[in-house]
Amino acid sequence: MTQPPQTSRATIFTRAAVIWLVLICGEILHGIARGIFLVPHVGEFRSNQIGVFTGSIIILIIALAFVRWIGASHPRDLLAIGFLWLILTLAFEILFGRFVMGASWERLAADYNIARGGLLPIGMLVLMLSPLIAAKIRRVA
């Protein structure tokens, strides 16, 4: 029985970057839906808290759908992909939030302050671990 050919690291990380674009599109749609359907009922702050958990589910579903296609099977590579997604997402959130939405630095930082109810660090942890979690569930790693 022959082993399938190994996917190159360049291919793995290119595919991971493509899937990050899918993740960001999913999160943008999630944010729009939250703003339309949830914010009017529970307010912005509570909506953001709920959104961390619903967004984490969306991220895990996308990771589950694409983890085989990405081609990484070693836990080190899967964690590196998660770290790539984390860095890209943080950069996107800061650049988009600050320069497109006009949010203050204090407003951006508030979502990361667990002591004041900001739960985004939990979502970022899920994002970073999602390739590894998905690979374990799919028995890729």
Please provide the spans of the model-predicted regions.
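Core segments of alpha-helical transmembrane spans in multipass integral membrane proteins
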Residues: 26-27, 48-68, 84-85, 122-126
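Short alpha-helical transmembrane interface motifs in multi-pass membrane proteins
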Residues: 15-19, 47-48, 89, 119
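N-terminal signal-anchor transmembrane alpha-helix
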Residues: 6-39
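Membrane-water interface at the C-terminal end of transmembrane alpha helices
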Residues: 122-141
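Interfacial helix-loop-helix junctions of multi-pass membrane proteins
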Residues: 36-46, 95-112
